[in-house]
Amino acid sequence: MKTLSPTGYGLLLVLPLLLAVLQSTTAHKNDINIYSLTVDSKVSSRFAHTVVTSRVVNKGSAVQEATFQMELPKKAFITNFSMIIDGVTYPGNIKEKAAAQEQYSAVARGESAGLVRATGRKTEQFQVAVSVAPAAKVTFELVYEELLARHLGVYELLLKIQPQQLVKHLQMDIHIFEPQGISFLETESTFMTNELAEALTISQNKTKAHIRFKPTLSQQQKSPEQQETVLDGNFIVRYDVNRTVTGGSIQIENGYFVHYFAPEVWSAIPKNVIFVIDTSGSMRGRKIQQTREALIKILGDLGSRDQFNLVSFSGEAPRRRAVAASAENVEEAKSYAAEIHAQGGTNINDAMLMAVQLLERANREELLPARSVTFIILLTDGDPTVGETNPSKIQKNVREAIDGQHSLFCLGFGFDVPYAFLEKMALENGGLARRIYEDSDSALQLEDFYQEVANPLLRLVAFEYPSNAVEEVTQDNFRLFFKGSELVVAGKLRDQSPDVLSAKVRGQLHMENVTFVMESRVAEQEAEFLSPKYIFHSFMERLWAYLTIQQLLAQTVSASDAEKKALEARALSLSLNYSFVTPLTSMVITKPEGQEQSQVAEKPVENGNRQGNTHSGHSSFQFHSVGDRTSRLTGGSSVDPVFSHRRGWKGQAQGFEKMSYLPPRLGPPGPLQPTRFSHPFSRITLDRVLPEVLSVPDETSHDMDSRIIGATIPPPPARIQAPSVILPLPGQSVDQLCVDLKHSQGPVKLLSDPGQGVEVTGHYEREKARFSWIEVTFKHPPLQVRASLEHIVVIRNRQSSAYKWKETLYSVMPGLKITMDKAGLLLLSSPNRVTIGLLSWDGPGKGLRLLLRDTDHFSSQISGTFGQFYQDVVWGPPAAADDSKRTVTVQGHDHSATRELKLDYQEGSPGKEISCWTVVL
């Protein structure tokens, strides 16, 4: 984490989506001490009001600078910030941006304050510094608000905690109040230990939930001997609400209403989707590889009633015909996607026009399903370089070609992409833009975006209210409604409005129109929000203002100059009236006399190729290459040189540019000398540390070490390997069994137990003797965990969350707990269930390993390659004098079992040697 100043303090708190960060900036943690830090977040009907309060004291003997640094979600609006120093409050004042800059420039001589900047995928960073006298105390308080959006069926609050020091009073409280009722609630943490879990309490009833985290000093410590904190990571709350057949809920508070609408009772409308893929040279390498992976997965998720096209462009856009998503066509398209290569220029204009032409031609020829929806998904990573390159002209061409008939979604890959250009083009055509961050999970980001739009349930959705009942209503017409999302409309009740607010929502299903009728009694709804414990005053009015401002700002992107001026004027007025820091306003922060008198906090706007100090949300690292051509080899390393049998080898193997390793010299100890050899070695294993650097012999070196010529090199002893799996067998004469897969290749069903509601499959690579991936699927809760050598992906409600191996994880949901420790052991457990473990094994036979615990919970329905050993297993008598061989009968089939030395991987690398009965399958 970045250090901002010689002294300071900190805590990173993220709540998306709620998010806040107070980060340590001190090299001397005892000087600036955080003695109290509290987070209070009240979520009332999806609208989150978060207050972060930090109290610090300067324990040093000199003046110290304390830097208050926080991260908050990009869609959140700061509403207040203040500092209390020696009993005097220094508030932040929100003003029009131009006026705030003028005030600041008068003090700072025109220098930019830079108090808020974009930092991550979903976050912005706020920071302010103040000098603190010895023994003086400072209280910082930041308030921000956000409407939580429903994403793939869940609302999410995320807290990222990194105090970097022990805090005497650390407390986080999250109150959730949902009048519709909370259907499920789950928590996840990347720092939680069993001891810390005792500081977490969750209470919940039908409509309310309270989550409190209040660790003691001892619970925060890494160990009793260390004064360092273990708090370093994420804490996440996910939930959803109950829904009626109508899918809607009208809620009223203090003269304002909000209407939530999310029906999920029909099958999806057939869709016709054109994927326009940038295959220009700038996409080569990791980008095009991840694009191929995502496309193959997305194609497999197409519905049988869907139609699709693939359009790639690389200087010229090749034409491809529209096809139905039949199994044959999907497999053909997957093969095509797997062969996509990056080369040439970026021809956005022609590729986009061709995509529209394909849809129009299919429509004219009546090839598209009746009343289906059509949209185009564009993925690109750079500016147009071939054909039409003027962004405004491309936008005009695309807008005229689409003519309101299709929806356009633009995905910008990386930070070199012209995001403002893509955003305007998408919004002008009924879609949206999304940035895809260059990272190990880029393919997952693409897949997740597709899942958001994969299931359109309604089209042309319109909300209607009596004109004598409401006014100043937010957007009430929507082109599409997708499964897992939510449409939100808010407004103001008229002074003489009826006692009952009625509403109609009209939309189109696949083959019919539908109208939803809802009513809400004003007095009853007002009574729902009387409890001050769970709501803050006039929250629904602020929700209405927040939503109105967000929509006005979105409209300015594609508006004409005259329209833009009017939209911005209204958004500015609301921002000032409700004290929101938006792209049109700034917060002027005053300081004590003698310090820099004021600073300005502004809302960053994502409208350029690169946003100043924007990063992907991960730390930056510097990589240094070694300049010399030698390598130091250490004990236990192994190298696999392959040398040509051809004559005339001149200091290097055929097909290799250079060689930087040689075998250890045979014979008595002595100084290491460069050696040459005249015959190939297929493998050389170095089992000791070589004290000198070995270099490649030059071309003129023809002397052979006499001790190597004619010497017999004994083969290295075979390493003890970890088996494919170790199966605990409770209640049998053999307490555990090692199973090696020697004859399997490709997907293997390892376990299937309908009684437990679990299935485990894996992909076995016979040549490498390892699993390349293992997938665990649970029926209740519906969840899938897919582990590869690189990372773990948890999929729930079509939403993917990726985790790196050896990251601490602690997730509790109804019916399942997921944990992972620093050793990389992932455990999936639940009462009265078999515990399934996954491990990325770094020892000999590197690869994924499966662990099983509590196997007595398997039902009589268990089956599979490994599961069969929990059904009707009979061990025969010893078949050898030394009791090293036995026969084991499994479901009537005999298998030979041999007692062998194996590495037990169950506690991680390096493993320990065990004697284990081994069966080869």
Swiss-Prot record:
Residues 591-646 are annotated as: Disordered. Keywords: Acute phase, Disulfide bond, Glycoprotein, Protease inhibitor, Secreted, Serine protease inhibitor, Signal. The keyword Signal applies. Appears to be both N- and O-glycosylated. One of its GO terms (biological process) is acute-phase response. GO terms for molecular function: serine-type endopeptidase inhibitor activity. Type II acute-phase protein (APP) involved in inflammatory responses to trauma. May also play a role in liver development or regeneration. This is Inter-alpha-trypsin inhibitor heavy chain H4. Glycans are attached at residues 80, 205, 242, 513, 577, 712. Residues 270-428 form the VWFA domain. Residues 28-146 form the VIT domain. InterPro entries: ITI_HC_C, ITIH, VIT, VWF_A, vWFA_dom_sf. Disulfide bonds join 738-916. Interacts (via C-terminus) with DNAJC1 (via SANT 2 domain). It comes from the Eukaryota. Liver specific. It is found in: Secreted. GO terms for cellular component: extracellular region. Belongs to the ITIH family. Residues 608-623 have a biased composition (Polar residues). Residues 1-27 form the signal peptide. Its main location: secreted. Induction: Levels increase significantly after cardiogenic shock. Specifically induced by the cytokine IL6 in hepatocytes.
